[in-house]
Amino acid sequence: MNALNQAHCEACRADAPKVTDEELAELIREIPDWNIEVRDGHMELERVFLFKNFKHALAFTNAVGEIAEAEGHHPGLLTEWGKVTVTWWSHSIKGLHRNDFIMCARTDKVAETAEGRK
């Protein structure tokens, strides 16, 4: 079991530190299916989840929305027919915080039981 998917987010202020290169190398191993993307000069974590249809993709989007609301940390979500792209980063620090890795792991946990996964 991944310890990250059991962790909770901490409040992240604009002066919170971004993950260091060492932390990044360690944490990314915990979420091997996620990709690091650089957009607008900052790193983001992104993964595409495939589903059998739009209804299942939308249900997964809503489930991710529920954990985001519970933790007070919100992703970018793009819901399409049979596909959901989830992107985590910390807006307040314009980069990656430990919270983002926690939420990737928690998203993976939601995906394990999501109906209609391909």
From Swiss-Prot:
Record keywords, A-Z: Lyase, Tetrahydrobiopterin biosynthesis
Matching CDD domains: PCD_DCoH_subfamily_a
GO biological process: tetrahydrobiopterin biosynthetic process
SUPFAM superfamilies hit by this protein: PCD-like
Origin: domain of life: Bacteria
Catalysed transformations (reactions): (4aS,6R)-4a-hydroxy-L-erythro-5,6,7,8-tetrahydrobiopterin = (6R)-L-erythro-6,7-dihydrobiopterin + H2O
Record's keyword annotation contains Lyase: yes
GO molecular function, one term: 4-alpha-hydroxytetrahydrobiopterin dehydratase activity
A UniProt-annotated Pfam family: Pterin_4a
EC number(s) stated in the UniProt entry for this protein: 4.2.1.96
Function: Involved in tetrahydrobiopterin biosynthesis. Seems to both prevent the formation of 7-pterins and accelerate the formation of quinonoid-BH2. May also have a positive regulatory role in the expression of phhA.
HAMAP family with a match to the protein in the record: Pterin_4_alpha
Family: Belongs to the pterin-4-alpha-carbinolamine dehydratase family.
Name of the protein: Pterin-4-alpha-carbinolamine dehydratase
Species of the source: Pseudomonas putida (strain ATCC 47054 / DSM 6125 / CFBP 8728 / NCIMB 11950 / KT2440)
Gene that this polypeptide is encoded by: phhB
